[in-house]
Amino acid sequence: MANSAQARKRVRQNNTRRQHAASQRSMIRTYIKKVDAAILAGDYDAATAAYNKAVPVIDRMADKGVIHKNKAARHKSRYNKAIKALKA
């Protein structure tokens, strides 16, 4: 348990930040699910549209440190590859 005022404040801040980051991670997952669903359906246009909406969100969360930048790059690369395979 935090005993000093400074430590109590850090606990409050960490709780707030953790909740906010959890919300942002959930948002990323929602965008990724939409891309995934469009790819599995085989719909190139829908997959491209969903991917184009998801990329800026993924990049923004990586910049903020919500997810690691390599994880963001991995998601983008894999989905881009899958979308290109739909067109071929």
Swiss-Prot record:
Compositionally biased region (Basic residues): 7-20
Key words of the record: Ribonucleoprotein, Ribosomal protein, RNA-binding, rRNA-binding
One GO cellular component term noted in the UniProt record for this chain: cytosol
Annotated InterPro entries: Ribosomal_bS20 (IPR002583), Ribosomal_bS20_sf (IPR036510)
Residue segments, region Disordered: 1-25
Single GO biological process annotation from the record: translation
One protein family per Pfam: Ribosomal_S20p
Keyword Transit peptide: no
GO molecular function, a single term: small ribosomal subunit rRNA binding
Gene3D superfamilies named in the record: Ribosomal protein S20 (1.20.58.110)
Keyword Cytoplasm: no
Function: Binds directly to 16S ribosomal RNA.
Family per similarity comment: Belongs to the bacterial ribosomal protein bS20 family.
Protein name: Small ribosomal subunit protein bS20
Native organism: Psychrobacter sp. (strain PRwf-1)
